[in-house]
């Protein structure tokens, strides 16, 4: 059984890590920002903590699999992420935000089960992807900075 201190640490770490990803989305004015990412991560962490708690209580009475609840979280976040995706004449927008919601759900699940270092590493890699690869996309690939992640500038600009 986890102590209150362990539970608080896991929940707080989930908020901090997922908040960092959400802050990047907020700064770039995406559909889902700081609060949404924090709530997805916090909820995922709490669901994992609850799953572990239930598993611990009933492990000798009923065969349970704590991973089943985690799988439900990932499926549910897929629906939430789909709500951030917008398709118009210019292309598709919101794919990166949908992916970031999926990542923070995984970070929340990882912190909830005590897999703290991988949760931290995944957050760092997500932030590197969101902050630094944006620059590479703009300069090397010629992507527009309008949130449209499926449209590219013409290769022969000015012709």
Language model features by range: what are they?
Residues 10, 68-69, 114-127:
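Loop-to-transmembrane alpha-helix initiation sites
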Residues 137-159:
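Intrinsically disordered, low-complexity non-transmembrane regions of multi-pass membrane transporters
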